[in-house]
Design a protein with these regions (language model features):
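Left-handed beta-helix
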Residues: 1-97
């Protein structure tokens, strides 16, 4: 993907331009918009991350899904998720946490 820096793992996901995925970070089954930064050891699973979002080290966004019912975690534009924060599946976050 143009302009992305991927040092972690990305599976079944869509990345826009200028996304940074740090070493040890995992992104699965998610959509990550432009300028987002996923820091070291963060896990993103079944989530939509809007533009210019920073996900801190060790944060957990969304959850692995099983069965036919899916819950997507959504992070709004220009927010910061602090280190080690958990955002559960189905939550919509539109301010810093």
């Amino acid at each position: 993907v143009s302009g992305c820096e991927i040092e972690g793992t990305v599976e079944n996901s869509i990345l826009s331009h200028d996304v940074k995925i740090a070493e040890g970070a995992v992104v699965r089954n998610s959509i990550i918009y432009a300028g987002a930064e996923i820091e070291k050891n963060a896990v993103i699973d079944h989530a939509i991350i809007d533009e210019n979002v920073k996900v801190g080290k060790g944060a957990k966004i969304g959850a692995e899904q099983k069965g036919s019912s899916l819950s997507i975690a959504v992070l709004g534009r220009d927010i910061t998720v602090s280190d080690n924060t958990v955002v559960e599946a189905g939550k919509i976050i539109d301010e810093n946490v």
